[in-house]
Amino acid sequence: DNKELYVNLFTASTLDWTDTGLKLAQETNYPEEETSTISITAAPKSAVTFRIRIPAWSKGAKIEVNGKAIDGVTAGEYATVAGSWKVGDKIVVTIPLQLRTESTDDRKDIQTLFYGPTVLNALNPSTKFIQRGFYERNGLDGTIKLGVQKKEGTKNYFIIDGDEFEPAYNGDNTPYHMYFQRKDEYVGFAGKLTDVLNPKRPAAQDRSESTLMDDIWAGAPFKDRAAFIKKVQEVTKTYQDE
């Protein structure tokens, strides 16, 4: 209807929308950087509403129009940016890049490591699943923050427990693992494992098999340490009662 423009991908590009007169340029190095700037290079004949996709995995995404933040930026939805546009107007989208894991559909213990939208492969020649634990590395927002270092002089390369993780798009011939097996035998927080076993809750009709740590971190993000401790106490009591 020449009134709405959907932005689904953050990639360096230009648009010449002849029917409306709108021209724009998107400048970005995403996903190696977390911002994308959309600049109006020719004004449309009438108002155009931008619908900007905010990835479901994102935390803390924001959009600024000419330096002013807008409301209604929600993960997993399209943010609405409406207005009458002139040459030089800028929309800056910021999607913080954070480490996280995602499980396969059929097994929670088989996971992949992501940095923002980027799959990270572990460079390792083993012919068996490598095992890694990540819950003890989580920050309050549920993303991985502890016990991880970026490889010096690189972007999107990380070192974890001696293994180098690189973007899947790198595409060289080094043996790698795209999936790893989660190692979660013990409870761990704030970068440290304890000697307390991480109990499992068997699968039931209304849920898949899970562990104490699974159920605690299902409540992330936590607004503060008190909210996190409260969740730990609630979940622990549930396991004790069962």
Regions found by a protein language model. Give the residues of each.
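C-terminal beta-rich recognition modules with glycine/proline-rich loops and embedded aromatic residues
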Residues: 1-39, 74, 83, 94-186
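Short strand-turn-strand beta-turns centered on an Asx-Gly dipeptide
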Residues: 63-71, 116
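Short, surface-exposed beta-strand/beta-hairpin micro-motifs centered on an aromatic residue
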Residues: 78-80
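Soluble extracellular-acting proteins and domains
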Residues: 185-242
